[in-house]
């Protein structure tokens, strides 16, 4: 199977030749590590701050890594005193919806309070540009589809509320301090680096495409489909998947807009086309040539039937396009990464500690 790669260019109104030193918070994680590669390709100087609670030091292949928490005010003071950052990209957060319901204080502390500490350091050192990783979970249950930026934000879990609260704080910081930000609301991030250097290594894994491919490779006994009675053509939930490299391109364009003096803004990021759980499984079987073991379970509370993005505003204002986000391409890149992980584990069975931060790799089921 031929895998698609793509070279991106910014629209004419956004300059790309501005030298920059970027602080990437959470750069050892899934999306953050892909962003480091994109920024390095653009010639940026890079510093990553990550506590490695969910990220991996070996994913920080570009720039320097400072191991520590974004909630550590003393550490931030040292960092901002030592470096003159042009902007900050903030990827660090806890992202599991279920865990946010059972441990809301942990999520508000990590996602909201730690971001306040970061903003205080930025304000103290006159760093006034931030690209923030937000989420479609700020919208809650969809009132219409596809969902644009005008859709009411009514988050239904602490994870979504923590991100929504940060968005409100950022709007206030712009008005009070001139600290400009771009909030990027992902729908379903998926895929892996087209060149095979990076990919998903969540532990535990919660993203559907990665889980399906683990079932295809044999690292997982099966994939569980939660609910077959939704009001969709095949009865399973529909989601909008956007390639991680496309997300990084949106971050790059947002950064360039801020560096060029552009205003604060929020954008929805998605492919604009949804795929059902059953379609994802079928696509995985086509790409891998393997049968995916499937089990069926009841609906999960709070799962909407359909979540699809209207990303026209990002196209109009940033010139962004989801160029790699067709399901076949996403699946192909993710499968390439899954195969590379399996090969490493076959060559060195004890490599799971290094690859996955010491968590058990062979856990079966969901």
What do the predicted segments below correspond to?
Residues 2-192, 366:
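N-terminal Rossmann-like NAD(P)+-binding domain of SDR-like oxidoreductases, especially those catalyzing
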Residues 57, 187-208, 218-239:
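Short, flexible, glycine-rich and Lys/Arg-enriched loop motifs at helix boundaries
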């Amino acid at each position: 199977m031929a895998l698609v790669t793509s070279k991106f260019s910014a629209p004419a109104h956004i300059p790309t030749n501005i030298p920059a030193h970027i602080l990437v918070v959470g750069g050892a994680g899934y999306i953050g590590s892909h962003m480091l590669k994109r920024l390095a390709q653009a010639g940026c100087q890079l510093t990553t701050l990550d506590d490695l609670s969910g990220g991996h030091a070996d994913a920080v292949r570009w720039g320097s890594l400072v191991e520590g928490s974004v909630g550590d005010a003393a550490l931030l003071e040292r960092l901002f005193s030592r470096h003159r950052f042009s902007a900050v990209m903030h990827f660090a957060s806890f992202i599991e919806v279920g865990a946010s319901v059972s441990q809301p204080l942990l999520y508000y502390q990590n996602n909201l309070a730690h971001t306040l500490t970061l903003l205080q350091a930025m304000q103290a050192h006159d760093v006034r540009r931030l690209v923030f990783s937000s989420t479609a979970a700020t919208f809650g249950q969809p009132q219409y589809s596809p969902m644009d930026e005008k859709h009411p934000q009514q988050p239904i879990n602490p994870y979504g509320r923590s991100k929504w609260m940060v968005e409100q704080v950022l709007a206030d910081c712009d008005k009070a301090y001139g600290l400009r930000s771009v909030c990027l609301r992902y729908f379903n991030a998926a895929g892996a680096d087209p060149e095979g250097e990076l990919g998903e290594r969540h532990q535990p894994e919660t993203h559907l495409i990665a889980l399906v491919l683990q079932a295809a490779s044999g690292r997982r006994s099966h994939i569980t489909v939660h609910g077959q009675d939704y009001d969709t053509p095949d009865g399973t939930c529909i989601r909008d998947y956007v390639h991680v490299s496309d997300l990084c391109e949106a971050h790059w364009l947002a950064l360039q807009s801020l560096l060029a003096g552009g205003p604060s803004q929020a954008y929805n990021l998605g492919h604009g086309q949804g795929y059902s759980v059953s379609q994802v499984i079928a696509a995985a079987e086509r790409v891998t040539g393997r049968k995916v073991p499937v089990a069926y379970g009841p609906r999960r509370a709070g799962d909407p039937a359909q979540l699809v993005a209207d990303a026209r505003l990002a196209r109009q204002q940033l010139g962004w396009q989801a160029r790699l986000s067709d399901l076949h391409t996403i699946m192909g890149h993710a499968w390439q990464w899954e195969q590379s992980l399996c090969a490493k584990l076959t060559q060195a069975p004890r490599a799971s500690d290094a690859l996955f931060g010491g968590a058990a790799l062979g856990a079966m089921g969901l």
